[in-house]
C-alpha cells in the first residue's frame, strides 16, 4: 500500500505567560496565552521516525519565555512578530505561525484609588494577534474574542421561514445580546518597526462597537454585515 504525506503542522498550544513588573510601588501585569505552529521539512519524522529536524515543543515554550524575559513591553502583535521570525529562521521551517491571546486586567478600585497591586479580570473581550512568518515575509492579523454586547432596542426579527415546528413569534423591537469574535488583517506596514498596533486595535474595536450600537438590525446576520470602514 502506498501513501502520500499531505500538508501538516505541529506545535505547542496554550503556553501561559504572565509577567509582572515591580519597578516601584505600582505593579504592571501582562497575561498572555501563546500558540506556536510550524510547517516545513519535517516529513522524515512522520515517515521514517527521524527526528533530526524536529524542534521540540519544549523548545518552543522555553523560547517564548526567553523572548518575553528580554522584552514584553509592547503590543502582542510586536511580540508575536519576534517569536514567529525566530522560528522562521530555522532552515527546515517554511512557515512559523504564532497566535496570542492577551487577557485584560484592570486595577481594582479602592477608596484610596486604583489598587497598585490588585487586579480584576476585564470584561472587554480578549485581544487576539495572529502572525505568520515565512522567510522575510510576514502577515499580521488582529482581533478580539469573547466580546459580550447587548442592546435593548433597534433589533427586530420578522419574515423568517415558518413551519409546523416554529413557535418563535415575530418581533419588531427586541433585546439583542451576543458574544463577538472579530478579526482583521493589516497591510505590509504592520511588519515594519514603528507600526502602532495599539492605536489600530483601539480604532477597530471602537468602530465595531459603534456599528453594533447604531445599526438598526433586522437580524443578527444583518448586524454582522455593515461596513466598518
PLM-predicted stretches and their roles:
Residues 1-228:
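N-terminal intrinsically disordered, cationic/polar leader segments
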Amino acid at each position: 500500500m502506498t501513501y502520500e504525506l499531505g500538508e501538516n503542522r505541529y506545535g505547542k498550544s496554550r503556553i501561559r505567560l504572565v509577567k509582572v513588573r515591580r519597578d516601584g510601588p505600582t505593579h504592571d501585569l501582562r497575561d498572555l496565552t501563546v500558540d506556536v505552529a510550524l510547517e516545513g521539512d519535517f516529513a522524515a519524522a512522520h515517515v521514517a521516525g527521524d527526528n533530526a529536524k524536529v524542534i521540540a515543543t519544549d523548545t518552543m515554550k522555553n523560547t517564548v519565555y526567553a523572548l518575553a524575559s528580554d522584552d514584553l513591553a509592547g503590543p502582542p502583535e510586536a511580540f508575536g512578530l519576534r517569536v514567529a521570525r525566530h522560528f522562521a529562521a530555522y532552515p527546515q521551517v517554511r512557515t512559523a505561525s504564532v497566535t496570542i491571546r492577551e487577557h485584560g486586567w484592570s486595577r481594582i478600585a479602592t477608596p484610596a484609588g486604583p489598587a497598585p497591586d490588585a487586579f480584576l479580570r476585564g470584561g472587554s473581550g480578549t485581544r487576539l494577534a495572529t502572525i505568520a512568518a515565512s522567510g522575510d515575509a510576514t502577515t499580521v492579523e488582529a482581533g478580539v474574542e469573547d466580546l459580550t454586547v447587548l442592546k435593548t432596542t433597534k433589533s427586530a426579527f420578522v419574515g423568517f421561514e415558518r413551519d409546523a415546528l416554529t413557535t418563535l413569534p415575530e418581533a419588531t423591537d427586541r433585546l439583542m445580546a451576543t458574544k463577538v469574535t472579530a478579526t482583521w488583517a493589516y497591510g505590509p506596514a504592520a511588519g515594519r518597526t514603528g507600526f502602532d498596533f495599539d492605536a489600530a486595535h483601539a480604532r477597530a474595536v471602537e468602530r465595531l462597537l459603534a456599528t453594533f450600537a447604531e445599526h438598526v438590525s433586522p437580524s443578527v446576520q444583518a448586524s454582522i454585515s455593515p461596513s466598518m470602514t
